[in-house]
Amino acid sequence: MEYSCVDDSSTTSESLSISTTPKPTTTTEKKLSSPPATSMRLYRMGSGGSSVVLDSENGVETESRKLPSSKYKGVVPQPNGRWGAQIYEKHQRVWLGTFNEEEEAASSYDIAVRRFRGRDAVTNFKSQVDGNDAESAFLDAHSKAEIVDMLRKHTYADEFEQSRRKFVNGDGKRSGLETATYGNDAVLRAREVLFEKTVTPSDVGKLNRLVIPKQHAEKHFPLPAMTTAMGMNPSPTKGVLINLEDRTGKVWRFRYSYWNSSQSYVLTKGWSRFVKEKNLRAGDVVCFERSTGPDRQLYIHWKVRSSPVQTVVRLFGVNIFNVSNEKPNDVAVECVGKKRSREDDLFSLGCSKKQAIINIL
């Protein structure tokens, strides 16, 4: 077929003229230049919360959905229009929570940076606690994790306000109330004792929980109830968070819940830390109090056991041997009556016979 095209002189010029006109090339170029049926756009994520779009038609980079950057340190915009706060500790990001207002997120960063870096840290706003150290004392009384937890749950302002009322007066100066709390009987009478509990070995052991006596729990710390086939029972949810202040002004956060398995009310999260810091041991007494004022603030403190724990050997329900003084527990025997006394006499007789046999051998 190629030979016939070359031998025909009449068609040579046509073939040459046709070859000079770039019809195939034009068709190919049209095919290459025409956009595909489905337009394809490549996305490249940029920094600062913006995404860069590579437009395949004109080859230009265009910005879309660019989030406005914040003018405050430690504040980052969120796609939903809210603002997040963050701080870096040892090259790791610590998330402080999400807030509706940009200034609120900036204030949360300022609180965190004063706890993490100290009072001289660079903040977004001028510190409002110059001239008194109420907030500094509050920050020092709580760990970094506790401050971050308050900021995330938006409870920092409430807890600081409770502490500030006991720390400063109307002029913003120390009121000395923290010392009066322990030295003034009138202040002590402003609290009512709810109940006391002597902690058991399991309360201060590896179970990491404190069992609240049922009668006191239902009276002073009632939980929302739910209707079941057995009647009204406390809601078996994850429980609620309660704040209790100790005598140093430190606020302790405990998770208070109801366990269906053991049908008991317990303090779980936060309790093990309280045991460790206060060095609680079995036999110590934990006291729960409530203020008589309108705030109804809850308090917790503890007392060392009045006498050392004595290990007693029991046989058939009778205290027969006291390990601490290595003598028979005469007091326990005297309280049980004549029957237990006769049993104790028989036991003593048996011990003396065994001792006599050993001496003979």
Curated annotation (Swiss-Prot):
UniProt cross-references to PANTHER family, sorted A to Z: AP2_ERF AND B3 DOMAIN-CONTAINING TRANSCRIPTION REPRESSOR TEM1, B3 DOMAIN-CONTAINING TRANSCRIPTION FACTOR ABI3
DNA-binding region: 71-126, 195-306
Keyword Nucleus among record annotations: yes
Start and end residues of each stretch annotated as Disordered: 1-73
Protein name in the entry: AP2/ERF and B3 domain-containing transcription repressor TEM1
Organism (species): Arabidopsis thaliana
Known role: Transcriptional repressor of flowering time on long day plants. Acts directly on FT expression by binding 5'-CAACA-3' and 5'-CACCTG-3 sequences. Functionally redundant with TEM2.
Gene: TEM1
Disulfide pairings: none
GO MF annotations, alphabetized: DNA-binding transcription factor activity; transcription cis-regulatory region binding
Tissues in which the protein is found: Expressed in leaves.
GO biological-process terms attached to the record: cellular response to hypoxia; ethylene-activated signaling pathway; photoperiodism, flowering
Pfam family, one: B3
